[in-house]
Structures are given as structure tokens and as C-alpha cells.
Regions:
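N-terminal glycine-rich FAD/FM-binding segment characteristic of electron-transfer flavoproteins
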Residues: 1-258
């Protein structure tokens, strides 16, 4: 079984985020990028399938993604058999989900996989559209919000999670696309020495792909910081003064009596 795991680099949320002048995107020039946390879960689940069945795991990323090399080398250090950096043969955007799905579909049309395991969503979109869009391009069955995958017979058995702690199991014939919410265990740690070994070995492959027919997708009209709906009053003084002021405020609002 050949498993392909698409990976995406997203802005590190510990960084200060600034907007572009036209307020349609974040300013990416000086940001640090890290692997999307849901893709890290997807990679771990793929590696668990490999551990159990001997499957081949190939991590792929788009060449336009900042810092994607680090994520791909880390995937090799964790146990992926190969890592591929994909470039588009035509103009394509790596920030729009529809364009990412089209380019990944173009690669997979040339390099088919028995199973595509990707994160259910990304930290910079939270729309969950990549797995179903990719499956639609490829004409494959798709299951998302998955928390376990196991190779079985002519396909895979997956556990899909619902609200309220409910879940159910499905058997899906391969080839198929699976969107992982969480792996069965926390993503494994890759020692720095192993990542450096992967870098020194020059293990990244490159590939060109022609995007499949992309849907128009979404257009961001405006990004802006949350608008303040009220104000906070800072209380100063010693403990007794602050306590008395709090009681007065609660009385003024009718929340306490006396």
C-alpha cells in the first residue's frame, strides 16, 4: 500500500501577526512557518499504518509553502520512506485551498496512491475543505474527522468521530482520501540529529504537476482584528480598596444586594 500524506506549512501562532496594506491577507514576509498541527496528526496515523502493515509512506508538500523543507525532512526523520516537493507547471496559489487541492490532484494523477491521509483542516483556514476537494478531483471516496485508520482486506477501516463522544467504524475501499482529526497517539518525536541526517542525505525529491481544473474557490474580502465591543476598567489600590470597589460595581449592576 502506498500512502501519500500532503503537508502544509502555516504561520506560527506565537508570532505577532500583521496584515497586508489591503487587508486581504496576513503579511507573510517575516513570519516563521511551522507544520500544520493536523497534518502532523495525519503523518503519525500514516506511520502507525506503516508500522502495522508495512505500507510505504510518502510525505508531499508544495514548493511555494515557506519552510516546507523543514517539515518534509522531519517527516523522513520520523519514518516516512520518501518526501516530495511539488512545483506547479502553471500559475497556482498555495494559499487558496481550492488551488492546493487542484495541484495535489495533478500530482496524484501522475503518481497514484492507494490512500491519501491528510489533516482534516489547517490552522490558517479551519474550513476542512482540502480532503473533500481532493477526493472530488480524483473521483475517490472520502471520509473526514477520522481518529483511527487500519489496513484491512481491499481497503481500510476508519473510525470517524462525532460530537458528544460518539464515533463509528467504516470500511472504505481504496484508493480513498481520509481527513484525520487526531492520530491514535501523539505525534512521535524526531531527534535533531536524525533531521540533520535527512538533510545531509539530500532526501527531498522534486516533482512538477499540472493542476487539475480548479474551482473558483473563496476570495477574502477583508481581514481585520476583532472589534472591541466594550471596555475593561482597571482597579488599583490595596486589597481592601479593590475589594470594596468590586462590591460597589456589583451593587450598581444589581448583581448583589445590601
Amino acid at each position: 500500500m502506498r500512502i501519500v500524506v500532503p503537508m502544509k506549512a502555516v504561520p506560527d501562532l506565537v508570532e505577532e501577526i500583521e496584515l497586508t496594506a489591503d487587508e486581504t491577507d496576513i503579511d507573510r514576509e517575516y513570519l516563521k512557518f511551522v507544520l500544520n498541527e493536523w497534518d502532523a496528526q495525519a503523518l503519525e496515523e500514516a506511520l502507525l499504518v506503516k508500522d502495522a502493515s508495512g505500507a510505504e509512506v510518502v510525505a508531499v508538500g508544495l514548493a511555494d509553502d515557506p519552510d516546507i523543507d523543514q517539515a518534509l525532512y522531519t517527516a523522513i526523520a520520523k519514518g516516512a520512506d520518501a518526501a516530495v516537493k511539488i512545483s506547479a507547471t502553471a500559475a497556482s496559489s498555495s494559499t487558496r485551498t481550492s488551488d492546493r487541492a487542484a495541484l495535489l490532484a495533478g500530482y496524484l494523477a501522475a503518481e497514484p496512491a492507494d490512500l491519501v491521509i491528510t489533516g482534516v483542516q489547517a490552522a490558517d483556514d479551519l474550513d476542512g475543505q482540502l480532503p473533500p476537494m481532493l477526493a472530488a478531483h480524483l473521483g475517490l471516496p472520502h471520509v473526514s474527522v477520522v481518529v483511527a485508520v487500519a489496513a484491512e482486506g481491499d481497503g481500510v477501516t476508519v473510525r470517524q468521530e462525532f460530537a458528544g463522544g460518539r464515533s463509528h467504524e467504516l470500511h472504505v475501499r481504496t484508493p480513498a482520501v481520509v481527513g484525520v482529526q487526531a492520530a491514535r497517539q501523539a505525534p512521535r518525536y524526531a531527534p535533531i540529529t536524525r533531521i540533520r541526517q535527512a538533510m545531509q542525505a539530500g532526501g527531498l525529491q522534486t516533482a512538477e504537476a499540472t493542476p487539475a481544473g480548479a474551482a473558483p474557490g473563496l476570495t477574502v474580502r477583508r481581514m481585520y482584528r476583532p472589534e472591541a465591543a466594550g471596555q475593561a476598567e482597571m482597579l488599583t489600590g490595596d486589597v481592601d480598596e479593590v475589594a470594596a470597589r468590586i462590591v460597589d460595581l456589583l451593587r450598581d449592576r444589581g448583581l448583589v444586594k445590601g
